[in-house]
From Swiss-Prot:
Belongs to the COX15/CtaA family. Type 1 subfamily. It comes from the Bacteria. GO terms for biological process: heme A biosynthetic process. It comes from Staphylococcus saprophyticus subsp. saprophyticus (strain ATCC 15305 / DSM 20229 / NCIMB 8711 / NCTC 7292 / S-41). Coiled coil: none annotated. It is found in: Cell membrane. It is an enzyme of class 1 (oxidoreductase). One of its GO terms (cellular component) is plasma membrane. Residues 30-67, 115-122, 183-215, 266-271 are extracellular. This is Heme A synthase. Heme b binds at H214, H276. Heme o binds at H63, H125.
Length: 302
């Protein structure tokens, strides 16, 4: 059960389950299923499995089940990784972050159900779970020795790209928070057409301001990732990790902006909304890997 041969498939399983936790959370919010079990937690309407199962209750129960399963699988992965590859410097910190933020995520989710937190607190839930996902994702990359295959273990990231990337991480996280706030404030269709309601540009209420702020942050994120991508590709032509990684980040932000626009155009089509959540999850996981690479450079005296 805890042998090294289980490490690779277990890391993939943990990453996939954590991705489903992200999508499940988005699905709960988009379908208005947060109150699907009333104010009971961990029970649902006072029972382990209530007899009456409307779609909102089923969605909320499924999300809780997947979240519980993710904790079991991630704990299993962490124990195996700690035991067999704990000598790799990043493994133990990533393991602690994975479990720690998964527990915080569960507590915030439980508090939201039991005490009806306001939208600004609820918006933190998605960002917290993203940190846990990213830790598991990066741990998986390390387990599969992606570093060695793409010479990332010998990579030296110079200061300009490190600055670009730190700022990119901050901007993307702020964009994620404002996006989650849009969902929890039920502001997805506020502030009119995309990209702007040119016939009436002035926001009229809180929902309009929240939506406009998210659109502004998304634009800043797109421009900054484009600038960072151009710098990375032009200055690290010989390094596949940088070239492929930052190209993937730029592609993901294009997909993110596209699905964001389509969400408004289609009046929040559920499939497009879930793709929107998936692309930002993958983008943040990739940025987390960039951060690990930068920390290695700093640790080596760069």
């Amino acid at each position: 059960m805890f042998s090294k041969k289980n490490l690779k498939w277990l890391s993939v399983l943990a990453t996939v389950i954590m991705a489903f936790v992200q999508l499940g959370g988005a699905l709960v919010t988009k379908t208005g299923s947060a109150d699907g079990c009333g104010s009971d937690w961990p029970l649902c309407h006072g029972a382990f499995l209530p007899q009456n199962l409307p779609i909102q209750t089923l969605i909320e129960l499924s999300h809780r089940a997947v979240s519980g399963l993710s904790l079991i699988v991630v704990l299993w992965l962490v124990i195996v990784a700690w035991k067999h590859i704990g000598y790799i410097k990043e493994v133990k910190p990533l393991s602690c972050i994975s479990v720690g933020f998964l527990l915080i995520q569960a507590l915030v989710g439980a508090a939201a159900v039991m005490w009806q937190q306001n939208a600004y607190v609820l918006a933190l839930h998605f960002g917290i779970s993203l940190i846990s996902f990213s830790s598991v994702f990066v741990l998986t990359l390390i387990i599969y020795e992606v570093d060695r295959k793409y010479e990332a273990d010998e990579l030296f990231i110079r200061k300009p790209l490190r600055i670009y990337t730190w700022i990119m991480a901050l901007i993307v996280y702020m964009t994620i928070y404002t996006g989650a706030l849009v969902r929890h404030k039920e502001a997805s269709l506020a502030y009119g057409q995309w990209p702007l309601p040119f016939n009436d540009l002035m926001p009229h209420n809180v929902q309009d301001w929240v939506n406009l702020t998210h659109r502004g942050m998304a634009l800043i994120a797109f421009i900054w990732i484009l600038i960072t991508f151009i710098h990375a590709v032009n200055n690290y032509r010989e390094n596949r990790t940088i070239r492929y990684g930052y190209t993937a980040a730029f592609i993901l932000v294009i997909l993110q902006v596209t699905t964001g626009a389509l969400s408004i155009i289609t009046e929040v089509n559920l499939f497009i909304a879930l793709l929107h959540a998936l692309f930002i999850t993958l983008l943040f996981g990739l940025i987390a890997y960039f951060i690990i690479l930068m920390l290695r450079t700093i640790r080596s005296g760069g």
